[in-house]
C-alpha cells in the first residue's frame, strides 16, 4: 500500500511539473503586448557565452524573438526586414537579420561582422562584431528557423 501511495505521489508530481513548464514557442498577435507593436514569435531557449579560449560557459535561459517585417514597410528599411532578437538572462540583447530565399525559407544573414556556425550537437555558435570593434560570442540551442521553415 505504501509503495502504491509513493508511486501515485511521484506520478502526480511529474504531471504537475509537465503542466507548469512553458511551451518552447509562443505566438503573439499584433498589439498583444505593450512593448512590441507588431506580431512576433517567442522561443524559450538556452544560451551560453563563450570564453576567449573557445570553451562555453554554463547554460542560461534566453528568449529568442522572430520579428517579421511590418506590413507596407519598404524591404530596404529595417522595418521591412526579418530579424531575430536574442535577449540574454543578464538583459543584454542582440539582433540578427534574416534573409528569405525564393521559396520564402528564412536563414541567418552572415557577413558584415556576423558569423554563424552549427556545432553539430544541437547548438549553434554566433559571433557578432559590434560597431566599436568588440565581439559577442555565444552558443544557443535555438530551433526558431526550423520552426519557421
Predicted segments — roles?
Residues 18-19:
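C-terminal motif of bacterial Sec signal peptides marking the signal peptidase cleavage site
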Residues 24-149:
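Cysteine-centric segments in proteins
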Residues 6-13:
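Sec-dependent signal peptide recognition
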Residues 1-5:
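N-terminal secretory signal peptides that target proteins for export/translocation
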Amino acid at each position: 500500500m505504501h509503495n502504491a501511495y509513493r508511486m501515485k505521489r511521484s506520478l502526480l508530481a511529474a504531471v504537475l511539473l509537465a503542466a507548469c513548464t512553458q511551451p518552447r514557442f509562443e505566438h503573439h498577435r499584433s498589439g498583444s503586448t505593450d512593448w512590441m507593436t507588431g506580431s512576433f514569435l517567442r522561443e524559450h531557449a538556452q544560451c551560453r557565452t563563450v570564453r576567449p579560449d573557445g570553451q562555453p560557459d554554463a547554460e542560461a535561459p534566453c528568449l529568442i524573438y522572430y520579428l517579421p517585417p511590418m506590413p507596407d514597410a519598404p524591404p530596404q528599411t529595417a522595418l521591412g526586414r526579418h530579424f531575430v532578437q536574442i535577449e540574454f538572462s543578464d538583459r543584454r540583447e542582440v539582433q540578427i537579420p534574416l534573409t528569405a530565399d525564393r521559396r520564402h525559407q528564412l536563414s541567418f544573414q552572415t557577413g558584415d561582422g556576423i558569423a554563424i556556425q552549427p556545432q553539430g550537437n544541437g547548438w549553434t555558435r554566433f559571433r557578432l562584431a559590434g560597431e566599436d570593434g568588440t565581439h559577442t560570442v555565444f552558443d544557443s540551442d535555438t530551433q526558431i528557423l526550423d520552426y519557421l521553415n
